């Protein structure tokens, strides 16, 4: 499916934070996507049609996962290796008002195999980029937005290892070794056909140390600092539970690294004319901006992160700002994907070894949930996996919805609403 075809039935409303795909099949309308941070909509092809011949749809709730507090090392030690050539005076005159970063997405078999049709995978990835763009909506000088220009299915790119299932210790599962997988990606795919490549694995990223412990699965993505338009490592990597929109909460952070932003509290000089302020060396543990080192939010960037990205972009050549793809996936988004996602189904995909799948909210204010199961049918003892992110639009209780990682009063489009008054 090319960008022109996709554009015909994808709809976006940037202000209302919604993304749905509308497709006409056999004289009926099929709708799939995000209605809110918790609600999703999906067709029910096996259900009878209405008297008017319309295809039945289901609106269901979805919840999400989170960064582990130990997720600090998502940039490799060599992240600063190529920056000497960047630390130079550079003019901003060649930088456009809007930087459209072209994105090539590569997905592995554990991820793409969960989609029945190629069109469904393309739609899901396009909606993901739309929601990532919303996190970059308040960037300026330049405004940064991403264009999905190509998708590649790569059956196996992860270095894997078997270990006990964190959520179900009685069984094993396959993990992707984070460091060696990312090194392989840099070696084999580091030169992107676009401005940046996003490698998405359907496996859990982890450090394959022995003895294996739960904390080794804290890393959920990796990137090199300043990777955009780099000839050797224009690559970021994230994990994602297929259909969950979980990587929407991870990609802004990793792409921020690729655009020159270190973790909050750290500084890097890209342009001697635009040095980082001394205040940027201070890191407040209470300000959970997107580039927080251990507990990132997914709502907005700190001013220091924005300044780092501006300084990095000022060092890029004009060729990086030229659009190289002949077509891309522009989208029009109506409702947020969280409006229609079924969290139980997400738990089934994320935790196939579970005996049953129960969704339990956790840290509602940060929009997260757990997938839990009884250890046996004759026991009340339960086990839970790692936290997941609630997608944009999902219900987080008390008539609130999650939008950009915040539980608040929003409608299904992501627009702020007033608190409902009790009778």
Walk through the language-model features, giving the residues of each.
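N-terminal prosegments of processed precursors
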Residues: 1-46, 115, 168-187, 194, ...
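Divalent metal-coordination and catalytic microenvironments
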Residues: 11, 132, 198, 256, ...
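Short amphipathic alpha-helical interaction elements and helix-loop-helix interfaces
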Residues: 15-17, 28, 37, 50, ...
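Classical protein tyrosine phosphatase
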Residues: 21-45, 123-142, 254-263, 267
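A short, surface-exposed interaction/processing loop segment used at functional sites
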Residues: 30-71, 256
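Fold-level signature of zinc-dependent metallopeptidase catalytic domains
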Residues: 57, 61-230, 241-246, 264, ...
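The catalytic-center signature of Zn2+-dependent metalloproteases
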Residues: 149-170, 231-306, 310-311
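Cysteine-rich modules of extracellular adhesion/ECM and protease-associated proteins
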Residues: 262-423
């Amino acid at each position: 499916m090319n960008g022109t075809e996709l554009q015909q039935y994808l709809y976006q409303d940037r202000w209302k934070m919604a993304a749905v795909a509308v497709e006409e099949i056999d004289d009926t309308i099929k709708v799939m996507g995000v209605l809110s941070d918790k609600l999703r909509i999906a067709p029910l092809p096996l259900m009878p049609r209405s008297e008017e011949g319309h295809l039945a749809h289901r609106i269901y709730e979805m919840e999400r996962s989170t960064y582990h507090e130990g997720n600090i090392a998502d940039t490799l030690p060599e992240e600063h290796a190529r920056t000497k050539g960047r630390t130079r005076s550079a003019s901003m005159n060649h930088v456009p008002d809007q930087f459209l970063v072209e994105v090539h997405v590569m997905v592995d078999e554990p991820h793409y195999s969960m989609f029945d049709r190629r069109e469904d995978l393309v739609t899901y990835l396009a909606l993901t980029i739309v929601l990532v763009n919303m996190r970059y909506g308040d960037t300026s000088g330049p405004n940064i937005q991403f264009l999905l220009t190509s998708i590649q299915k790569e059956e196996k790119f992860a270095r894997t290892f078997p270990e006990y299932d964190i959520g179900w210790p009685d069984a094993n599962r396959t993990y992707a070794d984070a460091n060696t997988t990312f090194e392989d990606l840099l070696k084999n795919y580091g030169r992107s056909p676009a401005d940046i490549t996003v490698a998405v694995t359907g496996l859990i990223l982890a450090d394959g140390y022995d003895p294996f412990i739960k904390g080794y699965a804290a890393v959920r993505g990796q990137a090199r600092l300043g990777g955009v338009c780099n000839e050797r490592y224009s690559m970021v990597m994230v994990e994602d539970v297929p259909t969950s929109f979980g990587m929407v909460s991870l990609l802004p952070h990793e792409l921020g690294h690729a655009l020159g932003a270190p973790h909050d509290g750290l500084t890097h000089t890209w342009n001697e004319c635009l040095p980082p302020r001394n205040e940027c060396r201070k890191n407040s543990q209470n300000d959970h901006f997107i580039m927080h080192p251990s507990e990132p939010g997914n709502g907005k960037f700190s001013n220091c992160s924005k300044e780092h990205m501006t300084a990095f972009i000022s060092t890029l050549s004009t060729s990086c700002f030229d659009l190289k793809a002949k077509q891309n996936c522009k989208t029009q988004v109506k409702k947020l994907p969280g409006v229609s996602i079924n969290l139980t189904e997400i738990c089934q995909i994320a935790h196939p070894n579970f005996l049953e799948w129960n969704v339990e909210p956790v840290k509602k204010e940060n929009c997260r949930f757990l997938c839990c199961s009884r250890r046996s049918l004759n026991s009340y003892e339960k086990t839970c996996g790692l936290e997941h992110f609630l997608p944009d639009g999902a219900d987080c209780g008390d008539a609130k919805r999650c939008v950009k990682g915040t539980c608040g009063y929003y409608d299904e489009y992501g627009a702020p609403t007033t608190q409902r008054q009790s009778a």
